Amino acid sequence: MSDRLTLLRPDDWHIHLRDGAVLPHTVGDVARTFARAIIMPNLVPPVRNVTEAGAYRERILAARPAGSRFEPLMVLYLTDRTSPEDVRAAKASGFVYAAKLYPAGATTNSDSGVTSIDNIFPAIEALAEVGMPLLVHGEVTRSEIDVFDREKRFIDEHMRRVVERFPTLKVVFEHITTSDAAQFVTEAPANVGATITAQHLLYNRNHMLVGGIRPHFYCLPILKRNTHQVALLDAATSGNPKFFLGTDSAPHARHAKEAACGCAGCYTAYAAIEMYAEAFEQRNALDKLEGFASLHGPAFYGLPANTDTITLVREEWTAPESLPFGEQTVVPLRAGEKLRWRLLEKNA
């Protein structure tokens, strides 16, 4: 087995960069590995129109490391009031690539999200007309629904209906966490795809809960049981172009995670491709990593694959205990642990 792995440079089709003083840190981490990234719009206030998307894009570009060509692909945050005109303006901008459906209350900064999917059917119809993907956080949010069942219920109550009603709409079922979602995407038409995170390939709920609660494993959708983890590994390593890389890297300051009511999100951008390599290696499927990380996403979005490459080397290194995060610190996933693959820096 080779100790070096060279891939076409990957893209991240789902990431949270946050805003303000933390941008130089989060943008620097993603730009180290990825050429492009789909930027989540759940700021406070959210990115609801092309003007706000353009302003956020400029802040991200200004935070890039010197010499970086990293390209942020902006996303519109859908609300009950998003109009077809908002969608058409976003498409015409040339820098907004998708629109995001957050069910209200589903995750961090989603309070402005959609209260009923029926409210945004005119906007979804416009998305289908202009060829812009709908990105879906697929969880129901009613309090009586068990947190481990919310993804499956969303499929049954909403996803099937949306896919059937808008047969030409490109839909990305984001950060899928269940065998139900993997099966749904596999059986759906070619215009339905899904992203999968590194943490959902490497871990299950036992890692978060057994022997004590580990807040840095807590994300939404929440880690599920091992059988779902296995199904996600099957999907990611299958070579099926419907499945592609989306880290959902979502930083929170240490005090916001290590709290009585901690925030949801795992910070993986600093070593994401290294973690994916571990997951694929566990399945003896490193030959499938380039498709998942570098080819399937661009093909789904109708974009060219990158032409430059990255190289991973099989070399143990210890992840940092913490990383700078503006004036605070963030504890990354795998903090203080050994990783088996290392990205070979260009000047190394």
From Swiss-Prot:
It catalyses: (S)-dihydroorotate + H2O = N-carbamoyl-L-aspartate + H(+). It is an enzyme of class 3 (hydrolase). The active site is at residue 248. InterPro entries: Amidohydro-rel (IPR006680), DHOdimr (IPR004721), Dihydroorotase_CS (IPR002195), Metal_Hydrolase (IPR032466). GO terms for biological process: 'de novo' pyrimidine nucleobase biosynthetic process; 'de novo' UMP biosynthetic process. Keywords: Hydrolase, Metal-binding, Pyrimidine biosynthesis, Zinc. PROSITE patterns: DIHYDROOROTASE_1, DIHYDROOROTASE_2. Zn(2+) 2 binds at residues 100, 137, 175. Pathway: Pyrimidine metabolism; UMP biosynthesis via de novo pathway; (S)-dihydroorotate from bicarbonate: step 3/3. Belongs to the metallo-dependent hydrolases superfamily. DHOase family. Class II DHOase subfamily. Catalyzes the reversible cyclization of carbamoyl aspartate to dihydroorotate. Homodimer. This is Dihydroorotase. It comes from Pseudomonas putida (strain ATCC 47054 / DSM 6125 / CFBP 8728 / NCIMB 11950 / KT2440). The gene is pyrC.
